[in-house]
Amino acid sequence: VIMAAGMGSRYGGNKQIDGMGPHNEVLMLYSIYDAVKAGFNKVVFIIKHDFEDRFRELVGDVVKGTVKVEYAFQELGNLPAGCSIPAERTKPLGTVQAILAAKDLIHEPFAVINADDYYGTSAFKTMVDHLEKLAPEKHACMVGYYLKNTVSEHGHVTRGVCDVDENGHLTSVTETYKIQPFPDGTIRDTEKDPNGVILNPESLVSMNFFGFTPWLFDKAEERFTAFLKSLSPTELKAEYVLPVLVDQLMHEDGLKVDVLSTDAVWFGVT
């Protein structure tokens, strides 16, 4: 599942379909080729109707001879029964809404990635091997990246900072919104303090490369519904994101998340 509907508020434009490779290839094409090489056999693109034609031309039609391709649409109005949002809201509702858009297309274990991140060939092989042995309920996995390999010299990034126990299970994931390197070589969280709180560069972080089973969907819908109902009418920007959902399911539903570490160096568009 490739989440490609985000608006890219900091980057501007549709960064998911801007050309970046040596021949102006779209970044996610590299991920798709790596995934197919590793053993994935279907890709579901989560996009918006307003750039569907361009997306099909630049991405979907390019790979449809290589892998089965399906489309799901993340639109603001796609809400669980009984939920509503303020008419003036324009910001997407987050990555949980994105994967829920694909609910009816997925009946097997699946991986989730961002369209605007490149994860490295080895990460896809690690993921596909683990998905093949994932228990059908209350189990998931996540490829963790070393924080030092995922920061940007060009501004702050958002990462899910992970705690992992001695058995390699995720114990918590904290969505951290303003991480950046400092001139002294440290990496800091600057969200609440401009001087920053120093983070361990060897910490594992989530880059939204998760592996799930279809068990997730009903749980995600329940939690997404609760999130929407908790919003005040004046809240126009709050999002419900995958690391927050995973953290809740671990603590409230007994979800076990195996952390698969990789030395791959991430790169993406921030």
Please provide the spans of the model-predicted regions.
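A C-terminal functional module that forms or caps the active site or interfaces directly
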Residues: 221-255
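Catalytic beta-strand/loop signature of glycosyltransferases that borders the donor
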Residues: 204, 258-265
